[in-house]
Structures are given as C-alpha cells and as structure tokens.
UniProtKB/Swiss-Prot annotation:
Pathway where it operates: Amino-acid biosynthesis; S-adenosyl-L-methionine biosynthesis; S-adenosyl-L-methionine from L-methionine: step 1/1
Annotated gene: SAM1
Protein name: S-adenosylmethionine synthase 1
The enzyme's E.C. designation: 2.5.1.6
Residues that, per the record, bind Mg(2+): E9
Superkingdom field: Eukaryota
Class of this enzyme: transferase
One cellular component term from this protein's GO annotations in UniProt: plant-type cell wall
Chain positions with S-nitrosocysteine modification: C114
Length: 393
C-alpha cells in the first residue's frame, strides 16, 4: 500500500497574529450586537507593549475600542510584561475611519432595502472543503493540530500545567492512504509542539506534561505507535513570547483558520469583517455546501469554489470537484449545489444569520478554526439535506 505524509499546523490564542484576529472579531461582535447593519473592516497589529486597531467602520453602535482591546488581551492571559504583554498597561492606538462612500454605493446598491440586490463587498474567490476522514468532515491533520492548541490553552487556564504561557504552536504530520481520491489516515507520523513557558520548568518536565496532559487526551491511541516522532519544544527555550517575541497582524493565519493546507484558499482573511465582505461569508457558504455534499453521501470528498465581482449580487462562477469520489458526476452535483444554496451576499447573510454578533460569536471563530466546530453559533456547519438520486448498485 502506497502512503504519503501530509502536515498541518495551528497556533494558540496567545500567538500574536491570533491575538490580533481575536481583537478584530471582538470589535465586529460589539458593532453587530448594537447595529446588525454595521460595516466593519477592522485590522489589528501588535508589538511589544502596544496594540493598534485601525480600519474602516460605519456603525450606529457606541464602541469602546480601548476597552475591547484590553479585555481581549486579559482574557487570553496577557496580564504582565513577562508573559509578553500587559493588558492594563500597554499602549492602545485607534485609527478608525468610515467606509469609503464609493464602496458603500457600489456594494449596497444606493442602500437598497432588498437583500437580493446587495452586491459583493469586493471581488475574489473562496473555497469550501469537506472530507469523510473525521466526524467533523475535516482533515485529520488539521483537526489534531487545532485540538492540541486548544488543549494547551485549556490546561494552562485550569492550572493543570501552571508553567504554560499564552503563546504556542502545534503541528501534526499524518500518514495517509489515497483510496481512489478519498483520504484515509493510517497513523500520526510526527507531533510538534512549541509552547511558551515560564523560567522555572525544565525541558524534561515540559515533555512529560505535554505527552500526558495534551497529546494523550487529544490524539486517539489508534493513530500513535512506537514509530511516532515527538518534537516537544525542540528549540530548548521559549520564555519570551506573545507580542514581545513577535509582531502580530490580523489575517496572517488563513490556512490555520480553514483546512490546514488541504483543499484550496482564495487568499482572503476572515477576522474583523462583516458579512458583506465575501472573503468571509462566501467562504462560510461554500464550506456548508461542501460539507453537505459529503454528509449527504454524494461524495467522500468535495471542494466548492465561488467567485464574485464588487457590487454584483450574483456569483460569477461556482465550481465543484469531488476528486473522483462522487457517486454521480460532478456536473450533476454542481447543479444540485447551485439549486440548493443561494450565493448572493445578502441572502447568505440571512440564511446563515451572519448579522448576529455579541456574546463572543465571531470572537470564538478567531482561534482554533472557523470550520468543523460543534457550536450552534457556527451556522455554516449545519448540514443541508440535498435531494439527489443515488445510483443503483
């Protein structure tokens, strides 16, 4: 049996880029909670002792940007300079302007009240992917890397591994078998964890705790064997982290946010963007489409692409590829997808309830992945029943 290796990575909520994603989405939540028609394009950057929020926001909401920044940093665990940032003492800079009126009139059709006529917020192409290799219909390499990162945060915050600090990265290499286009995971080949830690802990303690409290609870035993390779803090020291260690910027972890390198990516980031930005809403609807194709048994694996022009409601193109795993031809699946999903931005917003912010709805998406999550707020993960005629055996 011929196999191959595929690797996916993830980063923790304390990684500087992910900190920025979370602040941008916390701002989005605050705007949408008070004004569901808010137009938000919020970027964040950070470096030692500084966080800056900037972009274009048109909203009726009253938003305390500085408070959102400090609250988000504090919730992650950035409470002193020695962990990488002090939420209460860092400088917070804000440079927010209103959305360009040129964009507004093109996108909103001179502020039409008709959702069917709302144009795309920009040009671009987005991809959705699904695979039957996990219950989440997500790639195993990505699922494991993401869950390891989430588990690191859990054992830090609950005190199981008190030596942990907020920043960290994970990476998982899985050995796969290609079963006529479908991906079948055989085993975990390599596990890599690099996590920020305090001065007091030894490398041996780090390795022992990571294996016992992070890897064991996350990676199913059937995927681990005596040949599995573990690289646990291989650099030997990771005390300086967070924005003190590296600059951070919104939108730099787009593969971690999606499918861990599987499928494809159109290049647009998600965080800090309201649903008129098809970078986000378009990617959400094609995930729902791809997941529904696989969940309905039409194929074992599916990729769906959609593309847009700024100001135009109808998509320019919709594409489906089942990697030759479809029980019916891809062109028939494409027809079903186009009949079953409304790809117009105004209708995607309604059908996926994307104007509803608050309660950390979009903040939750900004760490540990936008897809494959079992959470009612992730409306794009709901499988849609599709009508199709299964061929006779």
């Amino acid at each position: 049996m011929e196999t191959f290796l595929f690797t996916s990575e993830s980063v923790n909520e304390g990684h500087p880029d992910k900190l920025c994603d979370q602040i941008s989405d916390a701002v989005l939540d605050a705007c949408l909670e008070q004004d569901p028609d808010s137009k938000v394009a919020c970027e964040t950057c950070t470096k030692t002792n500084m966080v800056m929020v900037f972009g274009e926001i048109t909203t009726k909401a009253t938003v305390d940007y500085e408070k959102i920044v400090r609250d988000t940093c504090r919730a992650i665990g950035f409470v002193s300079d020695d962990v990488g940032l002090d939420a209460d003492k860092c400088k917070v800079l804000v440079n927010i302007e209103q959305q360009s009126p040129d964009i507004a009139q093109g996108v909103h059709g001179h502020f039409t009240k008709c959702p069917e006529e709302i144009g795309a917020g920009d040009q671009g192409h987005m991809f959705g992917y699904a695979t039957d290799e996990t219950p989440e219909l997500m790639p195993l390499s990505h699922v494991l890397a993401t869950k390891l990162g989430a588990r690191l945060t859990e054992v830090r915050k609950n005190g199981t591994c008190a030596w942990l600090r907020p920043d960290g990265k994970t990476q998982v290499t899985v050995e796969y078998y290609n079963d006529k286009g479908a991906m079948v995971p055989i085993r975990v080949h390599t596990v890599l964890i690099s996590t920020q830690h305090d001065e007091t802990v030894t490398n041996d303690e780090i390795a022992r705790d990571l294996k016992e409290h992070v890897i064991k609870p996350v990676i199913p035993e059937k995927y681990l064997d005596e040949k599995t390779i573990f690289h646990l803090n291989p650099s030997g020291r990771f005390v300086i982290g967070g924005p003190h260690g590296d600059a951070g910027l919104t939108g730099r972890k787009i593969i971690i946010d999606t499918y861990g390198g599987w499928g494809a990516h159109g290049g647009g980031a998600f965080s800090g963007k309201d649903p008129t930005k098809v970078d986000r809403s378009g990617a959400y609807i094609v995930r729902q489409a791809a997941k529904s194709v696989v969940a309905n048994g039409m194929a074992r694996r599916a990729l769906v692409q959609v593309s847009y022009a700024i100001g135009v409601p109808e998509p320019l193109s919709v594409f489906v590829d089942t990697y030759e795993t479809g029980l019916i031809p891809d062109k028939e699946i494409l027809k079903i997808v186009k009949e079953s999903f409304d790809f117009r931005p105004g209708m995607m917003t309604i059908n996926l309830d994307l104007k509803r912010g608050g309660n950390g709805r979009f903040l939750k998406t900004a760490a540990y992945g936008h897809f494959g999550r079992d959470d009612p707020d992730f409306t794009w993960e709901v499988v849609k029943p599709l009508k199709w005629d299964k061929p006779q055996a």
